[in-house]
Each structure stands twice: as structure tokens, then as C-alpha cells.
């Protein structure tokens, strides 16, 4: 936001940001931890099922349990730090400081990305068994609503705002998917049973050493 933005709009946006910051501190980390055990329970169940069925892909699931148990709390803790940062820069954001706008968008992107990542393991393991609404959607929403409130609060052309919304939305989707794909690539490359021998079919490139 800039000083050209009306006082009423700035107060509204700051209110949304402060509410999000509080939720990032008191809600997001605990909800992130709460999702871990249900996912791990069904992951371990599927691993045992694959072993009984002699499914050769079971080793690729073994690292998934460790990755989920690390990255869910990791994103929760990062959200806490981002929430504290938002509280610290709220006055500067209200005053229209350019650096505060960029930093606030960065902080709000953390629960947005983390929540988007958390949706997939939940749906694959818990949702496929129990159904229901993924709690990670709420985590993602905590970041997304204030993110776009800050981004679109400036006075400007409606068409430009639509473009900004779509571009930044796709940037967020790309960032979250890149993290999720890196998560999957890691467990596949490091989980194959013949490691450190390169698994059959893995392309040898300049970065092939990353698969060892």
C-alpha cells in the first residue's frame, strides 16, 4: 500500500493482515502438527500393504513418512516467524513504506505455500480413506486472503488488477508445486532400493550426481 491509498482501505487491509498474523502464530503451527500423525498412520499402513503384496514401489514410500514429519512442523514454524514479522512491520505497512509491502507479501506467502503443499499428502492418505475437508486449505487461506488484500489495495486500473491477481496467483501455484515436486523427487531418487547404484531408467545428466 502507498500513502495514496485511502485511510479507510489501509485500515481495513491492516486489520486483515493483523488477524492473519495472529492466526499464523496461534493456529497454523498447531494445525500443522495435528495433521502429521493421521497421515503417517495411513502411510505406514500402505507401506505394510505394499510389502505384503510384494509391490516393488514400497521402498519409495519409506522416506515419505520422514519428509512429512519434518516439513509439516517446518512450515508451521516458518508461519510463526512470518506472523511475528508481520506484527513488527504493520505500522510501516500502514504508513505506505515500499519495503514493508514487499516483506508482508513474502511473509503471507509462507502459509499459502505451506498449506498448498500440505494438501497433497493429506488427500493421498487421509482423504482417500476418510474423505472430508482438508485442514490445509484453511492454512492456505490464512495466507492467501491478506496476500491479495495487500497486493490489490492500491488504486489502479481494474484490468491491471486482474492481471496482477492472475500473475501472482500462478507464481504462488508454481512455487508450491515446485516444492511439492522436489519433495516427491527426493523420496524417489533416495528411496530406490539399489541406491547408490543409479536406478534403471534415470537419465544421466550434468546434475545426475544429485540422485546418488
Residue ranges and their predicted role:
Residues 2-212:
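Topology signature of small-to-medium multi-pass alpha-helical membrane proteins
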Amino acid at each position: 500500500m502507498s500513502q495514496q491509498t485511502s485511510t479507510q482501505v489501509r485500515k481495513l487491509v491492516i486489520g486483515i493482515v493483523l488477524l492473519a498474523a495472529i492466526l499464523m502464530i496461534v493456529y497454523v503451527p498447531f494445525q500443522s502438527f495435528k495433521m502429521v500423525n493421521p497421515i503417517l498412520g495411513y502411510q505406514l499402513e500402505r507401506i505394510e500393504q505394499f510389502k505384503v503384496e510384494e509391490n516393488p514401489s514400497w521402498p519409495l514410500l519409506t522416506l515419505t513418512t520422514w519428509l512429512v514429519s519434518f516439513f509439516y512442523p517446518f512450515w508451521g514454524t516458518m508461519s510463526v516467524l512470518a506472523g511475528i514479522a508481520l506484527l513488527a512491520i504493520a505500522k510501516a505497512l500502514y504508513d505506505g513504506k515500499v519495503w514493508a509491502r514487499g516483506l508482508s507479501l513474502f511473509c503471507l506467502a509462507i502459509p499459502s505455500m505451506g498449506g498448498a503443499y500440505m494438501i497433497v499428502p493429506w488427500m493421498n492418505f487421509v482423504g482417500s480413506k476418510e474423505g472430508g475437508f482438508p485442514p490445509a486449505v484453511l492454512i492456505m487461506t490464512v495466507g492467501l486472503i491478506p496476500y491479495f488484500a495487500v497486493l490489490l489495495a492500491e488504486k489502479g486500473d481494474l484490468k491491471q488488477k486482474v492481471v496482477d491477481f492472475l500473475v501472482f496467483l500462478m507464481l504462488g501455484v508454481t512455487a508450491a508445486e515446485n516444492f511439492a515436486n522436489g519433495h516427491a523427487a527426493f523420496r524417489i531418487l533416495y528411496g530406490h532400493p539399489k541406491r547408490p547404484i543409479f536406478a534403471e531408467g534415470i537419465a544421466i545428466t550434468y546434475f545426475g550426481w544429485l540422485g546418488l
